[in-house]
């Protein structure tokens, strides 16, 4: 068996086409979704990522702006900028690019975003709504993972899904989404004993720990679906996933590559959530 390659770039391209059509329909009603991104400092990777989000938003007809603040900007001034965006009726969605400089509390900033504009889905209010099954903004990488799984030809109901990693950004929220899809979910982490036995029983494996080579062919049962969220640069700057792709694809039923798997969908879901934010505040289904 050679696995089906779950091409995140193509899935993302198709999904964005649908978003573009919805944006055009909104514009006909007189509304244009706008994404505002706060970037503090000059971290090269962050700048590149923010520019990718801006470009992607504009390509589907949204307005996007980058609010670029100096590295030494005080927490108070970041909060002031955030307050301005919270109260700007033209802004549909806000996200703050992390990491932030040491003088700025990430938690304090994330909690200061208007929950109705929190397109990253990191505000405690939105996290809480996710866990009681209310409509809310779901973190973008987990949302992207679920979209990828739709293309994996697997009915998640009753399946054993194993998530490696318990972060608030990926591991925990994707576990909740898998539960909502009626999968039986196990979360593995750094204190888990005998990780192999859990993995070997899994119909679906989502690995999100940033540990290259963690999942090998011996860990995977034949036909399992593998979603690799890891993206750790090696000494040459090449991105490596958590999964040994070349060997695992020989036994898996479907697998995401790194790069080109989950990454493109993460940005796509930022756009999805920005569109959702605009629709919700305008009372449009």
From Swiss-Prot:
EC numbers on record: 1.5.1.5, 3.5.4.9
GO terms under biological process: L-histidine biosynthetic process; methionine biosynthetic process; purine nucleotide biosynthetic process; tetrahydrofolate interconversion
Name of one Pfam family that matches: THF_DHG_CYH_C
Gene3D superfamilies the record matches: Leucine Dehydrogenase, chain A, domain 1, NAD(P)-binding Rossmann-like Domain
Keyword vocabulary terms for this entry: Amino-acid biosynthesis, Histidine biosynthesis, Hydrolase, Methionine biosynthesis, Multifunctional enzyme, NADP, One-carbon metabolism, Oxidoreductase, Purine biosynthesis
Pathway assignment: One-carbon metabolism; tetrahydrofolate interconversion
Gene Ontology terms, MF aspect: methenyltetrahydrofolate cyclohydrolase activity; methylenetetrahydrofolate dehydrogenase (NADP+) activity
HAMAP family assigned to the protein according to its UniProt record, in alphabetical order: THF_DHG_CYH
Assembly, per entry: Homodimer.
Protein name: Bifunctional protein FolD
Species, as recorded: Staphylococcus haemolyticus (strain JCSC1435)
């Amino acid at each position: 068996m050679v696995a089906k390659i779950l091409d995140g770039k193509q899935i993302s391209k198709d999904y964005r086409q649908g978003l573009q059509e919805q944006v055009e329909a909104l514009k006909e009603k007189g509304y244009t979704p706008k994404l505002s991104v706060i970037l503090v400092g000059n971290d090269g990777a962050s700048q590149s990522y923010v520019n990718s989000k801006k470009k992607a938003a504009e390509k589907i007809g949204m307005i996007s702006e980058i609010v670029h603040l100096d590295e030494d900007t005080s927490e108070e001034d970041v909060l002031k900028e955030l307050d301005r965006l919270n109260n700007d009726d033209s802004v549909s969605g806000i996200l703050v690019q992390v990491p932030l400089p040491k003088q700025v509390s990430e938690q304090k900033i994330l909690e200061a975003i208007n929950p109705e504009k929190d397109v990253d889905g990191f505000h405690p209010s939105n996290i809480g709504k996710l866990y009681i099954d209310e409509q809310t903004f779901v973190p973008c990488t987990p949302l992207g993972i679920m979209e990828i799984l739709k293309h994996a030809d697997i009915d998640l109901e009753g399946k054993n899904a194993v998530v490696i990693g318990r972060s608030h950004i990926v591991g925990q929220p994707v576990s909740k989404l898998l539960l909502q899809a009626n999968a039986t979910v196990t979360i593995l982490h750094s204190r888990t004993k005998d990780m192999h036995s859990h993995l070997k029983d899994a119909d679906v494996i989502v690995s999100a720990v940033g540990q290259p080579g963690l999942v090998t062919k011996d860990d995977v049962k034949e036909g399992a679906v593998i979603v690799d969220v890891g993206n750790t640069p090696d000494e040459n700057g090449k991105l490596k996933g958590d999964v040994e792709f070349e060997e695992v694809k020989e036994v898996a039923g479907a697998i995401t590559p790194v790069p080109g798997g989950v990454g493109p969908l993460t940005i796509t879901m930022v756009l999805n959530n920005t569109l959702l934010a605009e629709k919700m505040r305008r009372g449009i289904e």
